[in-house]
């Protein structure tokens, strides 16, 4: 046999072995792990699993992109964030793990949000409210919130004494319905609903006051306004273990887009995942990073049905809706300058187009305002035409600025996270009456089915850093089973 022939055979064999290597490593012709969802939790989990030496991972994503609820969209000539927007919890003793990626690694444009001058930016029908009066009401609200922190610290760890934030407010202010004047409702909405996307009457006091995100990482928040999008954080993480093309886009056979998972079957020997296009995938384990809203819907069927304790944990928690409505105008009519970025509308109808933000720094000359609504207002607005929403907004801004020549808005962008079957909401909120033990049941695996997502982060649910850390934590649980045969999972957080 000639040397060229020998070399050719060697190259063919080497190529064949290289192509088979992932299957040989796994011991089967199937991937070790399937990850459902390519948001930051799924991508973070995949990265940690890969770092542990389990390279044979397959990611199935329902949409045509990665990033999940971190998603930029073009509007008024700029890219705006219709989902996650802030790095929340910065400049504290501990470092928020997302902040170095945003600020140092990727150097995304971000701006510290200044809420300190809010008292001078509260509007009613007819113009500005009296600043001294608003400040007095805000000071009182801060006193009540501080009393809530003190009360929260005394509650039994089991959660048996937990109460809603509204109940705490009643105790401290002796008001049967909580804050009820337009200014008090506006301040209350900004304090709680703007953070949790649900009202104080349903939100757990013990598990949200004070918020670990801010006690751990600091009180500052930074608004990401970069044309690459906040989602570039997810692309950065994915690029550390998935291949990319020359343009930097993820182009790896281990990531399959437009794969809508509809069924997950599991047994003691493996899992089978079926998608809407009739594709079938098998693996040793599956990591489900779908949102809490999706788990509460009928999009994914589990066979056999998940045990009752798991189903109860899923349905006990709230999937909140947080809607950021962007509005484009032909000219500016609102105040700008230091201390003017955020302003409130004190309506007799709580949460009615209540929190506004102008973008003098973030998107100069774009003439865009952002108004945020939540909960029932979000659901109502998602179900009506954008033209109706625009008309309602125009009525509000003309009431706030009666002395200005307010032109008609030229464009509007209304995200619809609640209506989207791949999300069914914006982020999770911790409701009254659910213990840490029950929360940990959300994360707990069922056989070879593992779960991750911001809703599985007991300490930081609802936040980007919570989703990122949850991916790592859930991956560690899977790795312990796959590599160390430590498959028994003890639900933590239970107290007597």
Swiss-Prot record:
Q: Which GO BP terms sit in this record?
A: polyamine catabolic process; spermine catabolic process; thermospermine catabolic process
Residues the record marks as carrying a glycan: 103, 150, 278
Main subcellular location of this protein, as a coarse class? secreted
Which cofactor names does the annotation list?
FAD
Q: Does the keyword Flavoprotein apply?
A: yes
Localisation per UniProt entry: Secreted, Extracellular space, Apoplast
Question: What does this protein's record comment on cofactor binding?
Answer: Binds 1 FAD per subunit.
Question: In which pathway is this protein known to take part?
Answer: Amine and polyamine degradation; spermine degradation
Protein induction: Induced by salt stress in shoots and roots. Induced by treatment with jasmonate.
Q: What is its EC number?
A: 1.5.3.-
Q: Name one Pfam family in it.
A: Amino_oxidase
Q: What's a GO cellular component annotated to this UniProt protein?
A: apoplast
Keywords of this entry: Apoplast, FAD, Flavoprotein, Glycoprotein, Oxidoreductase, Secreted, Signal
Question: Where is FAD bound in this sequence?
Answer: 61, 69, 261, 454
Q: Which family does it belong to?
A: Belongs to the flavin monoamine oxidase family.
Function summary: Flavoenzyme involved in polyamine back-conversion. Catalyzes the oxidation of the secondary amino group of polyamines, such as spermine and spermidine.
The name on file for this protein is Polyamine oxidase 6
């Amino acid at each position: 046999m000639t040397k060229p022939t020998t070399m050719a055979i060697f190259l063919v064999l080497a190529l064949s072995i290289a192509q088979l290597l992932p299957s040989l490593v796994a011991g089967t012709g199937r991937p070790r792990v399937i990850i459902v969802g390519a948001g930051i939790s799924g991508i973070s989990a995949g990265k940690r699993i890969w770092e542990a030496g389990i390279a044979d991972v397959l990611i199935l994503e329902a949409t045509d992109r990665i990033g999940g609820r971190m998603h930029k969209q073009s509007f008024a000539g700029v890219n705006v964030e219709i989902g996650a927007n802030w790095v929340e919890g910065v400049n504290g003793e501990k470092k928020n793990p997302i902040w170095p990626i945003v600020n140092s690694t990727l150097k995304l444009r971000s701006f510290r949000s200044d809420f300190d001058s809010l008292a001078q930016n509260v509007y009613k029908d007819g113009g500005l409210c009296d600043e001294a009066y608003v400040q007095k009401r805000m000071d009182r609200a801060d006193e009540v919130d501080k009393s809530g922190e003190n009360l929260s610290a005394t509650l039994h760890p089991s959660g048996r004494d937990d109460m809603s934030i509204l109940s705490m407010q009643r105790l401290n202010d002796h008001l049967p319905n909580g804050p009820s004047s337009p200014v008090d409702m506006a301040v209350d909405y900004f304090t709680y609903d703007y953070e949790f996307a649900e009202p104080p009457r349903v939100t757990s006091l013990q598990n949200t006051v004070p918020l670990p995100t801010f006690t751990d990482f600091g009180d500052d928040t930074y608004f990401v306004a970069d044309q690459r999008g906040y989602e570039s954080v997810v692309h950065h993480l994915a690029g550390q273990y998935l291949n990319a093309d020359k343009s930097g886009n993820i182009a790896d056979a281990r990531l399959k887009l437009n794969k809508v998972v509809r069924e997950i079957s599991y047994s003691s020997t493996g899992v089978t995942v079926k998608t809407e296009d009739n594709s079938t995938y098998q693996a040793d384990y599956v990591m489900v990073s779908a949102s809490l809203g999706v788990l509460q819907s009928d999009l994914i069927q589990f066979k056999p049905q998940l045990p009752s304790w798991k189903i109860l944990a899923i349905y006990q928690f709230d999937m909140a809706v947080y809607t950021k409505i962007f509005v484009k105008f032909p000219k500016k009519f609102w105040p700008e300058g230091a201390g003017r970025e955020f302003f409130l509308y004190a309506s007799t109808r709580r949460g009615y187009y209540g929190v506004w933000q102008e973008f003098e720094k973030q998107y100069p000359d774009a003439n865009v305002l952002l108004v945020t609504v939540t909960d029932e207002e979000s659901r109502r607005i998602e179900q009506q035409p954008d033209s109706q929403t625009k008309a309602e907004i125009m009525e509000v801004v003309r009431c706030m600025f009666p002395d200005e020549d307010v032109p008609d808005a030229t464009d509007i962008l209304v995200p619809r996270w609640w209506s989207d079957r791949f999300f069914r909401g914006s982020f999770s909120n911790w409701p009254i009456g659910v213990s840490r033990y029950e929360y940990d049941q959300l994360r707990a695996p069922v056989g070879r089915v593992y779960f991750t997502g911001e809703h599985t982060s007991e300490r930081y649910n609802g936040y980007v850093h919570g989703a990122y850390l949850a991916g790592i934590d859930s991956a560690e649980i899977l790795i312990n089973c796959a590599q160390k045969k430590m498959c028994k999972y003890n639900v933590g957080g239970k107290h007597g």
